[in-house]
Each structure stands twice: as C-alpha cells, then as structure tokens.
C-alpha cells in the first residue's frame, strides 16, 4: 500500500529592516526545540532573497546541471557537523585488506579473546586542482601544463586523501575501524548504526577530537545514493574538498545555536596571508607557507 503524501509551500523567514536574521533564526530554532515541526530538522539553510537557485546575479537563468552554489549556506548544530568520504581500505602486499590487532586490556581476565581486530581506511574527497589548489605547480610549469579557466568542468575532479588546512592535520585522512561480527559470524566494517560497508563506498563520518589519533572518525551512515552514482561511473567521491575543508573548520570552530539566535558572542577571526588568529593556537605567521605546502606541495 502506497503511503499518502502531502505537498506544501515551505515557509521562509526573512531578515528585514524590522526583524534581523538572528530573530528569524530564533523563531525557527525555538519551534524545533518545542517539537512543532512534523519532520526531523538537523539545521538551517540560508539563501539570498533576490537570486534564483544557483544564480550569482538577479538576472541569471537557472542552471540545468549540478553546480556548487556559493550563495547558499548551511548550518548544522555541532553534533551534526559531518563529512562524506570515499573510503579505501589499506592493503597488504598481496592485495588483501590489512587487518591490525589491538589488545583490549581489562576486558575479561579469564578470556583469551582480548585481541580486537581493525582495518585502516584512507578517507578521500573530491579534489580539482583548478578549484582547490595545485598539487605540483612547479612540475606543471616545466611540462607546459597551463591551467584551464573552465572551472565548471569536472574533467580534473578526482578522489584524493583529505588533507585539511584549517586547522592543518597531516593525519586527518587516516581512520581505524574496529571490525565486528555479522549475523553469519563474518568480520565486517560497520557504522555505529550497524550498517555494513566495504571498500570503495561513500560513508558519512563524525569526528571526536577527544579520541586517540587515528581513532577520531566514526562512521555513522552509508551514503547509498552517492555510492550508487559512483558505481554507475559518475564522479561522486563524497564531499568536494572545499566542502570537507569547510566542515572540518566548523567541527573545530562550531557556530552555536545561541550565536544564531542572538547574534552575540560570535568570535572575531582575522584570516590573511600573514597572520591567522584563532581561539586555540593564537597568532601564526606561517599560514601562507602552511597553505602552500598543504595545497600545492602534497
């Protein structure tokens, strides 16, 4: 039996001369906290009032192809800040998945089964040198490989290990996953909800900075929609690098609901080629060199 559907207009709350955008956020978030929405909400989307979807100017026609819209912004509560990655399992010299062992001390002194097994993943995102930074510009000059100005083409879009820049972490693309037994007794990689996933699958991950290095990513959901596109030959590798990098920054510098509801206590951040300030590290005069190394040298 088919489930009936209901189609309604979506209500937008605007920032006006009499009502700030923070007041509009407060109305929506208060309704959500009171359970007044019939559907699950996990954040807010901010769109310009005078632009069509995908447009950059008021008279732009709508685009009939997939494109990143730089004028639309999404906010999620800190606990929902996640990144979609294409996972690749570490391999042995024979081409099999590498399986490591961890000794679980103090579990059961009477048991000999205190070794837990895990797999190591490389987390990849979509990367295009023309949009996200050149991997080896010096060699490109030697080879007379000049950059293209066609930034909307996805010809150079490929999966690359995730090296974030803000904050920089050379090990952010490494993820260890404990393998668990399925109903048939086999050892599988699973999300925290019990979904089985394998090599070359797109998975949504959350990040916990309090965990040990290498164990900070937790798989929470298999992205069957994106994985299906990948298997059909489309260039879907999870989040694009600039999206993953932005989400990474939000994970480490979350915008809270209180900031959105009041417009208060929003941290000021100075970001330029010479000095970068943030609440954890203080001033750094090497950001330009770090960004060059992270985006161009690797």
Where are these regions (language model features)?
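Nucleic-acid 5′ end/cap handling module spanning
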Residues: 2-298
């Amino acid at each position: 039996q088919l489930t009936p559907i209901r189609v309604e207009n979506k209500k937008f709350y605007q920032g006006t001369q009499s009502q700030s955008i923070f007041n509009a956020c407060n109305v929506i978030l208060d309704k959500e906290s009171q359970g007044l929405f019939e559907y699950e909400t996990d954040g807010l989307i901010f769109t310009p009032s005078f632009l069509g979807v995908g447009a950059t100017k008021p008279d732009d026609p709508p685009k009939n192809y997939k494109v990143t819209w730089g004028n639309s912004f999404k906010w999620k509560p800190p606990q929902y800040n996640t990144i979609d990655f294409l996972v690749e399992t570490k391999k042995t010299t024979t081409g099999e998945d590498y399986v490591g062992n961890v000794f679980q001390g103090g579990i059961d002194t009477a048991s000999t089964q205190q070794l837990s097994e895990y797999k190591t993943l490389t987390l990849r995102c979509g990367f295009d040198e023309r949009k996200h930074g050149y991997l080896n510009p010096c060699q490109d000059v030697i080879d007379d490989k000049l950059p293209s100005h066609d930034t909307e083409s996805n010809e150079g879009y490929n999966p690359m290990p995730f090296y974030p820049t803000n904050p920089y972490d050379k090990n952010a693309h490494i993820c260890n996953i404990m393998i668990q037994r399925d109903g048939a007794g086999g050892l599988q990689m699973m999300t925290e909800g019990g979904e089985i996933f394998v090599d070359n699958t797109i998975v949504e991950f959350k990040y916990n900075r309090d965990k040990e290095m290498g164990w900070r990513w937790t798989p929470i959901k298999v992205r069957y929609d994106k994985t299906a596109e990948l298997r059909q030959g489309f260039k879907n590798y999870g989040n694009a690098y600039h999206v993953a990098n932005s989400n990474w920054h939000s994970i480490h510098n979350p915008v809270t609901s209180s900031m959105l509801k009041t417009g208060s206590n929003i941290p000021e951040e100075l970001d330029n080629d010479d000095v970068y300030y943030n609440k954890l590290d203080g001033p750094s005069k090497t950001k330009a060199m770090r960004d060059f190394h992270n985006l161009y040298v690797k």
